[in-house]
């Protein structure tokens, strides 16, 4: 088996489409039994411990987390597609693998609108 350098791997990833990168992330998660979403969510929590009072007052960006699609999964998939611009297959995988982040680092107003749309479709949503 040929050994690739990190630079070669980065170049290969730079030439991939967004959908191919999403599939790569999914395969890496399955192969190594990890979740990229958990790492992203855990990073702010570690920083928040150091300056918790200031962080709570200044929080302007939120992550919209789909906790559960509820009973009306098809409607939730449609809303996820509308919000993220994902294709049907990718949106279905995201909904099927809940809890997953739908959007990250969005302003409070936008996060609340997304949460409202998803909850109207029957999903259980959390803002972090």
UniProtKB/Swiss-Prot annotation:
GO cellular component: cytosolic large ribosomal subunit
UniProtKB keywords: Ribonucleoprotein, Ribosomal protein
A GO molecular-function descriptor: structural constituent of ribosome
InterPro entries: Ribosomal_bL12, Ribosomal_bL12_C, Ribosomal_bL12_C/ClpS-like, Ribosomal_bL12_oligo, Ribosomal_bL12_oligo_N_sf
A GO BP entry: translation
Pfam families in UniProt: Ribosomal_L12 (PF00542), Ribosomal_L12_N (PF16320)
SUPFAM superfamilies: ClpS-like, Ribosomal protein L7/12, oligomerisation (N-terminal) domain
Family from the record: Belongs to the bacterial ribosomal protein bL12 family.
Subunit structure: Homodimer. Part of the ribosomal stalk of the 50S ribosomal subunit. Forms a multimeric L10(L12)X complex, where L10 forms an elongated spine to which 2 to 4 L12 dimers bind in a sequential fashion. Binds GTP-bound translation factors.
Role played: Forms part of the ribosomal stalk which helps the ribosome interact with GTP-bound translation factors. Is thus essential for accurate translation.
Name recorded for this polypeptide: Large ribosomal subunit protein bL12
Origin species: Aquifex aeolicus (strain VF5)
């Amino acid at each position: 088996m040929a050994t690739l350098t990190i630079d070669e791997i980065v170049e290969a990833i730079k030439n991939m489409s967004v959908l191919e990168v999403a599939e790569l992330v999914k395969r890496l998660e399955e192969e190594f039994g990890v979740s990229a979403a958990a790492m992203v969510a855990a990073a702010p929590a570690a920083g928040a411990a150091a300056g918790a009072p200031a962080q709570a007052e200044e929080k302007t960006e939120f992550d919209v987390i789909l906790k559960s699609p509820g009973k009306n999964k098809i409607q939730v998939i449609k809303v996820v597609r509308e919000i993220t611009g994902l294709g049907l297959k990718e949106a279905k995988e995201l909904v099927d693998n809940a809890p997953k982040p739908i959007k990250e680092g969005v302003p409070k107003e936008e996060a609340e609108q997304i949460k409202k749309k998803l909850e109207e479709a029957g999903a259980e949503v959390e803002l972090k």
